[in-house]
């Protein structure tokens, strides 16, 4: 990014579209010193980013660029905003999770609710905007020309420290830290007094928190590395006179981490205690993990601490209203980063991301996608299959080069789409992508605005024409046929009064015996990998992996209001977007849950 900007700057300065290399290097030093920003959770990664930029701008006889004010350390997903601070601490912050005392959590929630409706809150936010003068001083520091000597670098370091130590900025940072801390506060006996709404408002008015609570806020800020963008870069996010941080970055590009927020048992125990992963069901694995409290107390304590850390993050992400569209279902960093970044870019800015396609197309992300379409932020979605192993993930895993804007009202209403690409070079081929108007997406899929599975412009135009001219099919309720019984009741050998537990992978189109666990090895059975049936077995019922109590199955069917017929038409729950058939059905006996 820095090289591209530098070449353009040099071209403008020289009037030559292909400027001399020395003028590009000169421009690159200015670009790095004024335009490039970054945040990383890992301090070492932040330092390596600086080193990389220094190597790019190395100029013998001149000091390295001063980057301390631009490359910073912190968790860029966890941070308050002026608008959320203005709203105070919501009651949902005190939702009990693993390790919390439910009675204490309930009491804090009740206290918070009373404080939110009390007289102290009648006049709202006591003030959360940072004076424009603070941002102006940061802008002046970064707007100066490149340091000519080591003394200039030291002078800038001292100026930055003075700005960071500004009392107004420090107070606002404490307020923002306290707001975040409320969502990850330990609700247990002996813990310091939590940051409830009343204490938070008092802090905003300049009243002290109390030594124990203050120490707790500082410790949590250190542990979770809260990062408040509007305070870290006040010259980028202007606040005075607005209800939220306005402004933002002109361009944001990146490939955010693709991870789940929740703790992955397999990843955690793979090296620490692999024996707990060798059991069949979730319930059995949980029992094995609980047994570590006696056999391996150190591993168990570390596991519980990691699990609580993940749950506190989930509570903050889902209850704080930081991510109203992306913090749904199983939380992932890629979805959260996508929504976060779209709020960090300026209204006339641009965003370019490499993200899993599911961030934009999966059902849990329907609200995020609908917002992107309705606000006309989405501009380009180039979907790639990983068949050439661009990323170290499964070949069938799709990722997208996603381009968006900051919400400017002057943008085009068309969205460019390409699907199932395997290389960037394919984009040069005619017809490799198609365009669709966002108004047509509302027509085709009014509920979620989801993209139809079209391969070229001809298919999307035909679908739009059919949708406009044909009558729509009325909505009809249907019942998802799945197993909702508790896995602790499952058994892996047949018992009397038990029925087979049927899995979607065991059926295919009009074929209830597509796969079976009969004569399957222990490892494949444990990992849920049935074998394909032979044509000679077509008339035989597929052998399941587990059986469930018949009473559990009948109770489940009754709650779903299913008919009392002996046979039911079942729909397979999952299908790949690339499958020829995305609705796979078979007829199964009613005795199969």
Model features per residue range: what roles?
Residues 23, 325-332, 356-360, 389-393:
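Alpha-helix capping and helix-loop boundary segments enriched in small/acidic/polar residues
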């Amino acid at each position: 990014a820095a090289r591209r900007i530098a070449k353009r700057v040099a071209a403008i300065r020289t009037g030559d579209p292909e400027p001399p290399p020395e003028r590009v290097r000169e421009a690159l030093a200015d670009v790095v010193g004024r335009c490039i920003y970054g945040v990383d959770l890992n301090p070492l990664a932040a330092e390596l980013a600086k080193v990389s930029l220094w190597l790019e701008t190395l100029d013998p006889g001149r000091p390295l660029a001063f980057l301390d004010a631009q490359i910073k350390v912190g968790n860029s997903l966890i941070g308050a905003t002026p608008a959320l601070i203005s709203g105070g601490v919501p009651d949902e912050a005190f939702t009990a999770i693993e390790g919390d005392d439910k009675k204490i959590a309930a009491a804090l929630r009740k206290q918070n609710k009373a404080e939110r409706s009390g007289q102290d809150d009648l006049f709202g936010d006591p003030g959360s905007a940072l004076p424009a003068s603070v941002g102006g001083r940061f802008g002046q520091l970064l707007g100066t020309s490149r340091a000519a000597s080591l003394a200039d670098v030291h002078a800038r370091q001292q100026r930055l420290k003075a700005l960071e130590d500004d009392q107004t900025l420090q107070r606002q940072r404490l307020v923002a830290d306290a707001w975040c801390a409320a969502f990850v506060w330990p609700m247990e006996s002996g813990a310091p007094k939590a940051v409830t709404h009343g204490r938070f408002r008092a802090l905003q008015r300049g009243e002290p928190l109390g030594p124990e609570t203050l120490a707790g806020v500082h410790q949590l800020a250190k542990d979770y590395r809260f990062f408040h963008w509007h305070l870290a870069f006040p010259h980028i996010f202007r606040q005075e006179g607005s209800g939220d941080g306005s402004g933002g970055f002109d361009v944001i590009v990146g490939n955010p981490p693709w991870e789940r927020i929740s703790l992955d048992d397999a990843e955690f125990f793979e090296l620490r205690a692999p024996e707990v992963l060798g059991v069949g069901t979730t319930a059995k694995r949980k029992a094995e993990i609980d047994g570590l409290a006696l056999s391996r107390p150190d591993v168990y304590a570390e596991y519980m601490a990691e699990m609580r850390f993940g749950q506190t993050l989930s509570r903050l992400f889902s209850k704080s209203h930081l991510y109203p569209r992306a913090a749904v279902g199983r939380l992932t960093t890629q979805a959260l980063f996508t929504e976060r970044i779209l709020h960090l870019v300026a209204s006339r800015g641009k965003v370019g991301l490499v993200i899993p396609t599911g961030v934009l197309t999966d059902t849990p992300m329907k609200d995020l996608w609908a917002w992107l379409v309705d606000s006309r932020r989405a501009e380009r979605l180039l979907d790639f299959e990983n068949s050439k192993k661009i990323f170290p993930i499964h070949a069938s895993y799709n990722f997208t080069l996603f381009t968006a804007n900051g919400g400017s009202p002057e943008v085009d209403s068309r969205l460019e789409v390409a699907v199932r690409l395997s290389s960037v070079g394919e984009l040069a081929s005619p017809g490799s992508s198609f365009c669709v108007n966002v108004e047509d997406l509302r027509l085709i899929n009014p509920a979620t605005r989801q993209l139809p599975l079209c391969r070229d412009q001809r298919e999307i135009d035909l679908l739009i024409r059919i949708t406009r001219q044909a009558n729509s099919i009325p909505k009809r309720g249907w019942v998802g046929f799945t197993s909702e019984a508790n896995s602790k009741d499952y058994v892996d050998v047949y018992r009397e009064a038990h029925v087979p537990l049927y899995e979607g992978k065991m059926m295919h189109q009009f074929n209830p015996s597509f796969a079976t666990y009969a004569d399957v090895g222990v490892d494949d059975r444990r990992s849920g990998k049935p074998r394909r049936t032979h044509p000679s077995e077509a008339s035989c019922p597929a052998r399941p992996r587990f059986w469930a109590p018949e009473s559990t199955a009948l109770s489940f069917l009754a709650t779903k209001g299913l008919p009392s017929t002996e046979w039911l038409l079942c729909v397979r729950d999952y299908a790949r977007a690339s499958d020829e058939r995305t609705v796979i059905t078979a007829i199964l006996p009613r005795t199969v849950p």
